[in-house]
Amino acid sequence: MSEGKKTKLITAGRDKKWTNGVVNPPVQRASTVVFNTVAEKNQAAINRANKTLFYGRRGTNTHFAFQDAMVEIEGGAGCALYPCGTAAISNAILSFVEAGDHILMVDTCYEPTRDFCNVIMKKMGVETTYYDPMIGENIRDLIQPNTKILFLESPGSITMEVQDVPTMARIAHEHDIIVMLDNTWGAGVNFSPFEHGVDISIQAATKYIVGHSDVMLGTTVASEKYWDQLREQSYLMGQCVSPDDAYLGLRGIRTLDVRLRQHAENSLKVAQWLASRPEVDHVRHPALETCPGHEFFERDFTGGNGLFSFVLKTSYPKATTALLDGMKHFSMGYSWGGYESLILANEPRSFNSLRTVANPNFEGTLIRIHVGLEDVEDLIADLEAGFARYNALVLEKEVSLK
């Protein structure tokens, strides 16, 4: 991350009109905004879409400061806020499609994104085609006359494939297709979406932006071409967040650089250690050559974070359960991006419902981990003890089969 961007994380969203003489923009809670004169009310109505106090759902100064910060960090023309990442994804898509449209969705998308397309979009008469994340230039073969959106998620959910975003965005724009990206892994700082051809960048700010596993929050930053429509459609669909959550997102931005760098350092050490383990088939960490699309990570990203996965050589759920159940520092839980380490296992059969065209066909269990900010030696020791439990049950099974 450049020095300029590090500084921007400290200064973003701290315009004097939001801070009013203090370091952090205060939390401003409001449903009703009152006006002193008819002229003042009328002026607010005219400017209600331009960060003007008008009605609570349009936002308060706390929201405006956070929105400014996200735009300063990611680029684009404006930022819409949502109560979670899934709401940001679904509302971004809903803002631009209608019955009869077609969406190209990466096959390694976040599971709720797939569910949204398969249930809500299908019911609305919008067709979804899932594509292999490594398709690259061949995405042009899947474009239809009614294709409205190309949706990317890079790296992919669980299996971590890094996409060739600039190439795919260029091809999409040749057909006037909107390019949307789930940029949660890049956190808006390690991947600059608008410099790589993205039109709308979406994040579950729940994760690294907030960084403490205690807030649900989503953001969508749009280019100038699409900002007005995204903003107004989101408003019509009633999307808003509490000022307290916006404040916590804004505060999380201040430590985003130092947290991400430590997450990345820790996770790479753990990934390299895992790559040397005899139980591990391969590691899917974007910074390692064993991860699909590693070359695009090297070209397009400025850093990593704590989330990656690895694949075991075998699938033995009883042994995997023993590995997970005895963890001291790795907790089992959904989401990621907080300061704590997390671990979850996916048996090969579980991918049958999560993939349409890009099933990796693993023979062994895939384990996804989020490496937190603990001492990395403690985390490695925790995993080493887990492998001891795992191997004991594998050996027990082998003996019983003799």
Region locations from a protein language model:
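Structural preference for beta-strand elements that scaffold enzyme active sites
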Residues: I149, I178, I200, H282, ...
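Conserved PLP-enzyme active-site core in the AAT-like
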Residues: L9-W18, C79-R277, K397
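Conserved N-terminal alpha-helix of the aminotransferase class I/II PLP-enzyme fold
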Residues: T37-A87, T113-V119
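Structural motif of enzymes handling amino- and sulfur-group chemistry
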Residues: M70, S234-A322, G326-M327
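PLP-dependent enzyme catalytic core of the Aspartate aminotransferase-like
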Residues: N118-V119, E127-T129, R259, T314, ...
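Conserved PLP cofactor-binding pocket of PLP-dependent enzymes
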Residues: A287, D325-L354
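Short conserved active-site loop signatures built around small residues
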Residues: M1-Q28
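A common structural junction motif
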Residues: G238, G326-S335, G386-E396
